[in-house]
Protein backbone atom coordinates (compact mmCIF):
# COMPACT_ATOMS: atom_id res chain seq x y z
CA UNK A 1 0.00 0.00 0.00
CA UNK A 2 2.79 2.42 0.87
CA UNK A 3 4.65 1.47 -2.30
CA UNK A 4 1.53 2.17 -4.35
CA UNK A 5 1.03 5.50 -2.57
CA UNK A 6 4.58 6.66 -3.30
CA UNK A 7 4.44 5.53 -6.93
CA UNK A 8 1.18 7.41 -7.52
CA UNK A 9 2.25 10.70 -5.95
CA UNK A 10 2.76 13.64 -8.28
CA UNK A 11 6.43 14.75 -8.15
CA UNK A 12 6.90 18.46 -7.48
CA UNK A 13 9.64 21.05 -7.68
CA UNK A 14 9.92 22.37 -4.15
CA UNK A 15 12.20 24.84 -2.42
CA UNK A 16 13.66 25.27 1.06
CA UNK A 17 11.37 25.80 4.01
CA UNK A 18 8.26 23.85 3.01
CA UNK A 19 6.82 21.17 5.28
CA UNK A 20 4.49 18.55 3.83
CA UNK A 21 1.47 18.26 6.12
CA UNK A 22 -0.65 16.14 3.76
CA UNK A 23 0.13 14.63 0.37
CA UNK A 24 -2.43 12.66 -1.61
CA UNK A 25 -1.78 14.56 -4.83
CA UNK A 26 -1.66 12.12 -7.72
CA UNK A 27 -2.43 12.08 -11.42
CA UNK A 28 -5.56 9.94 -11.26
CA UNK A 29 -8.43 11.28 -13.33
CA UNK A 30 -11.24 9.41 -11.59
CA UNK A 31 -11.78 11.53 -8.50
CA UNK A 32 -15.46 12.18 -7.90
CA UNK A 33 -15.83 13.33 -4.33
CA UNK A 34 -14.62 16.38 -2.44
CA UNK A 35 -11.19 15.74 -0.95
CA UNK A 36 -8.02 17.44 0.23
CA UNK A 37 -5.00 16.53 -1.87
CA UNK A 38 -2.04 18.54 -0.60
CA UNK A 39 -1.16 20.84 2.29
CA UNK A 40 2.22 22.56 2.46
CA UNK A 41 3.23 24.81 5.33
CA UNK A 42 6.06 27.33 5.48
CA UNK A 43 6.82 28.58 8.99
CA UNK A 44 9.38 31.13 7.83
CA UNK A 45 6.98 32.73 5.35
CA UNK A 46 3.97 32.33 7.71
CA UNK A 47 1.93 30.78 4.91
CA UNK A 48 0.40 27.57 3.69
CA UNK A 49 -0.77 26.16 0.36
CA UNK A 50 -3.75 23.83 0.15
CA UNK A 51 -4.89 21.86 -2.91
CA UNK A 52 -8.33 20.26 -2.95
CA UNK A 53 -10.76 18.68 -5.40
CA UNK A 54 -14.44 19.59 -5.50
CA UNK A 55 -17.16 19.88 -8.16
CA UNK A 56 -14.88 18.32 -10.78
CA UNK A 57 -12.24 21.02 -10.32
CA UNK A 58 -8.89 21.36 -8.62
CA UNK A 59 -8.67 24.25 -6.16
CA UNK A 60 -5.53 25.91 -4.83
CA UNK A 61 -5.49 28.29 -1.90
CA UNK A 62 -2.53 30.31 -0.61
CA UNK A 63 -3.17 31.79 2.82
CA UNK A 64 -1.45 33.11 5.91
CA UNK A 65 -0.94 30.99 8.99
CA UNK A 66 -2.51 33.76 11.06
CA UNK A 67 -5.91 32.86 9.51
CA UNK A 68 -6.86 36.36 8.41
CA UNK A 69 -5.42 36.59 4.92
CA UNK A 70 -6.02 34.67 1.68
CA UNK A 71 -3.50 35.57 -1.03
CA UNK A 72 -4.66 33.29 -3.85
CA UNK A 73 -7.77 31.18 -4.41
CA UNK A 74 -8.01 29.69 -7.90
CA UNK A 75 -9.65 26.74 -9.64
CA UNK A 76 -8.54 24.60 -12.57
CA UNK A 77 -10.18 21.94 -14.73
CA UNK A 78 -6.97 20.06 -15.58
CA UNK A 79 -4.24 18.82 -13.29
CA UNK A 80 -1.59 20.12 -15.67
CA UNK A 81 -2.88 23.66 -15.12
CA UNK A 82 -2.94 23.07 -11.38
CA UNK A 83 0.64 21.80 -11.28
CA UNK A 84 1.96 24.80 -13.20
CA UNK A 85 0.29 27.22 -10.78
CA UNK A 86 1.20 25.11 -7.74
CA UNK A 87 4.91 25.07 -8.50
CA UNK A 88 4.84 28.79 -9.22
CA UNK A 89 3.21 29.48 -5.84
CA UNK A 90 5.61 27.14 -4.02
CA UNK A 91 8.57 29.09 -5.36
CA UNK A 92 6.97 32.53 -5.24
CA UNK A 93 5.83 32.23 -1.62
CA UNK A 94 9.01 30.41 -0.66
CA UNK A 95 11.06 33.28 -2.09
CA UNK A 96 9.31 35.77 0.19
CA UNK A 97 6.89 37.48 -2.18
CA UNK A 98 4.21 37.70 0.54
CA UNK A 99 6.57 39.76 2.69
CA UNK A 100 7.22 42.34 0.01
CA UNK A 101 10.37 40.72 -1.28
CA UNK A 102 11.05 40.96 -5.02
CA UNK A 103 8.40 38.92 -6.88
CA UNK A 104 9.52 35.78 -8.67
CA UNK A 105 10.46 37.03 -12.14
CA UNK A 106 13.00 34.41 -13.13
CA UNK A 107 12.25 30.90 -14.28
CA UNK A 108 11.81 28.27 -11.59
CA UNK A 109 15.17 26.45 -11.23
CA UNK A 110 15.52 23.09 -12.94
CA UNK A 111 15.51 21.19 -9.66
CA UNK A 112 14.61 17.54 -9.45
CA UNK A 113 10.93 16.90 -8.87
CA UNK A 114 10.40 14.83 -5.73
CA UNK A 115 7.60 12.71 -4.26
CA UNK A 116 7.64 13.77 -0.61
CA UNK A 117 5.07 12.23 1.74
CA UNK A 118 3.57 13.87 4.80
CA UNK A 119 5.81 14.66 7.76
CA UNK A 120 8.95 15.79 5.93
CA UNK A 121 10.43 19.31 5.75
CA UNK A 122 12.80 20.50 3.02
CA UNK A 123 15.78 22.04 4.85
CA UNK A 124 17.68 22.82 1.65
CA UNK A 125 17.77 21.67 -1.96
CA UNK A 126 20.09 22.37 -4.88
CA UNK A 127 19.58 18.98 -6.54
CA UNK A 128 19.23 19.55 -10.29
CA UNK A 129 17.32 17.38 -12.73
CA UNK A 130 20.57 16.56 -14.50
CA UNK A 131 21.61 12.99 -15.23
CA UNK A 132 25.39 12.74 -14.66
CA UNK A 133 25.54 10.00 -17.29
CA UNK A 134 24.66 12.55 -19.99
CA UNK A 135 27.47 15.00 -19.15
CA UNK A 136 30.89 15.29 -20.69
CA UNK A 137 33.79 15.37 -18.23
CA UNK A 138 34.49 18.99 -19.24
CA UNK A 139 30.92 20.19 -18.64
CA UNK A 140 30.63 23.18 -16.27
CA UNK A 141 27.71 21.45 -14.55
CA UNK A 142 30.20 19.34 -12.59
CA UNK A 143 31.46 22.48 -10.88
CA UNK A 144 28.08 24.00 -10.06
CA UNK A 145 25.57 21.15 -9.74
CA UNK A 146 27.47 18.28 -8.14
CA UNK A 147 28.56 19.02 -4.58
CA UNK A 148 28.15 17.51 -1.12
CA UNK A 149 25.10 19.63 -0.25
CA UNK A 150 22.42 18.68 -2.77
CA UNK A 151 19.47 17.82 -0.57
CA UNK A 152 18.55 17.66 3.10
CA UNK A 153 15.07 16.70 4.25
CA UNK A 154 14.11 16.15 7.88
CA UNK A 155 11.29 14.32 9.62
CA UNK A 156 11.25 16.04 12.97
CA UNK A 157 8.57 13.82 14.53
CA UNK A 158 10.69 10.73 13.93
CA UNK A 159 14.11 12.42 14.35
CA UNK A 160 15.13 11.43 10.83
CA UNK A 161 17.43 13.34 8.49
CA UNK A 162 17.81 12.42 4.82
CA UNK A 163 20.99 13.77 3.25
CA UNK A 164 22.09 13.61 -0.41
CA UNK A 165 25.39 14.77 -1.88
CA UNK A 166 27.85 14.06 -4.69
CA UNK A 167 31.22 12.62 -3.69
CA UNK A 168 33.90 13.68 -4.46
CA UNK A 169 32.54 17.13 -5.29
CA UNK A 170 32.66 17.99 -8.98
CA UNK A 171 34.23 14.66 -9.92
CA UNK A 172 32.75 13.01 -13.05
CA UNK A 173 33.86 9.62 -11.68
CA UNK A 174 32.05 10.19 -8.38
CA UNK A 175 28.63 9.13 -7.17
CA UNK A 176 25.56 10.22 -5.27
CA UNK A 177 25.74 9.49 -1.57
CA UNK A 178 22.48 8.98 0.32
CA UNK A 179 22.42 8.81 4.10
CA UNK A 180 19.48 8.47 6.45
CA UNK A 181 20.33 9.57 9.98
CA UNK A 182 18.31 9.02 13.14
CA UNK A 183 18.77 11.02 16.34
CA UNK A 184 21.76 12.88 14.79
CA UNK A 185 23.83 9.67 14.91
CA UNK A 186 25.99 10.21 11.82
CA UNK A 187 28.31 7.39 12.86
CA UNK A 188 25.55 4.81 12.43
CA UNK A 189 23.31 5.76 9.50
CA UNK A 190 20.13 3.77 8.93
CA UNK A 191 20.81 3.96 5.20
CA UNK A 192 24.14 4.52 3.47
CA UNK A 193 23.73 4.17 -0.28
CA UNK A 194 25.85 5.08 -3.30
CA UNK A 195 24.60 5.33 -6.88
CA UNK A 196 25.70 6.98 -10.11
CA UNK A 197 22.46 7.40 -12.09
CA UNK A 198 19.70 9.92 -11.51
CA UNK A 199 16.94 7.36 -12.01
CA UNK A 200 18.54 5.13 -9.38
CA UNK A 201 18.73 8.07 -6.96
CA UNK A 202 15.02 8.73 -7.47
CA UNK A 203 14.21 5.05 -6.88
CA UNK A 204 16.27 4.97 -3.67
CA UNK A 205 14.60 8.11 -2.31
CA UNK A 206 11.16 6.68 -3.07
CA UNK A 207 12.15 3.44 -1.30
CA UNK A 208 13.30 5.32 1.80
CA UNK A 209 10.09 7.34 1.90
CA UNK A 210 8.08 4.13 1.52
CA UNK A 211 9.92 2.48 4.43
CA UNK A 212 9.39 5.55 6.60
CA UNK A 213 5.66 5.45 5.90
CA UNK A 214 5.65 1.83 7.09
CA UNK A 215 7.48 2.93 10.28
CA UNK A 216 10.43 0.65 9.51
CA UNK A 217 12.89 3.24 10.85
CA UNK A 218 11.02 3.86 14.06
CA UNK A 219 11.64 1.62 17.07
CA UNK A 220 8.72 2.95 19.11
CA UNK A 221 5.90 5.47 19.07
CA UNK A 222 4.52 4.82 15.60
CA UNK A 223 1.70 7.29 16.22
CA UNK A 224 4.06 10.23 16.73
CA UNK A 225 3.88 11.32 13.11
CA UNK A 226 0.08 11.32 13.11
CA UNK A 227 -0.15 13.46 16.22
CA UNK A 228 2.40 15.89 14.78
CA UNK A 229 0.41 16.13 11.55
CA UNK A 230 -2.73 16.84 13.54
CA UNK A 231 -0.95 19.64 15.40
CA UNK A 232 0.24 21.21 12.14
CA UNK A 233 -3.22 21.00 10.61
CA UNK A 234 -4.81 22.84 13.53
CA UNK A 235 -2.93 25.97 12.46
CA UNK A 236 -4.45 26.00 9.00
CA UNK A 237 -7.58 27.53 7.50
CA UNK A 238 -9.98 25.03 6.00
Residue ranges, per PLM feature:
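Negatively charged, low-complexity tracts enriched in Asp/Glu with abundant Ser/Thr
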Residues: 1-46, 66-77, 96-157
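Hydrophobic beta-strand residues in large extracellular and virion-surface proteins
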Residues: 20, 40, 49-51, 60, ...
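Short beta-strand segments
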Residues: 47-49, 160-162, 191
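Short beta-strand micro-motifs enriched in acidic
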Residues: 50-54, 156, 165-169
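Coil-to-beta-strand transition motifs
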Residues: 57, 159, 171-173
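Mixed-charge, Lys/Arg-enriched low-complexity segments
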Residues: 61-113, 174-238
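Residue-level detector of short, conserved catalytic/binding motifs and their immediate flanks
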Residues: 149-151, 162, 176
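Residues in well-ordered beta-strands of folded domains
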Residues: 154, 165, 179-181
Amino acid sequence: MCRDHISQLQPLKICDGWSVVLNNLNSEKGMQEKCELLILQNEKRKAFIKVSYENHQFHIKVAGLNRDKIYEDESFDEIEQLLEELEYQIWSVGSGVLEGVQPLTQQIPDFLRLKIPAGWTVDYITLKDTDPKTLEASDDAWLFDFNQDLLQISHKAKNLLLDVGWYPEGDPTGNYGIELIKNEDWENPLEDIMCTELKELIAQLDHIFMREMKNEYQSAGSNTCLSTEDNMRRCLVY
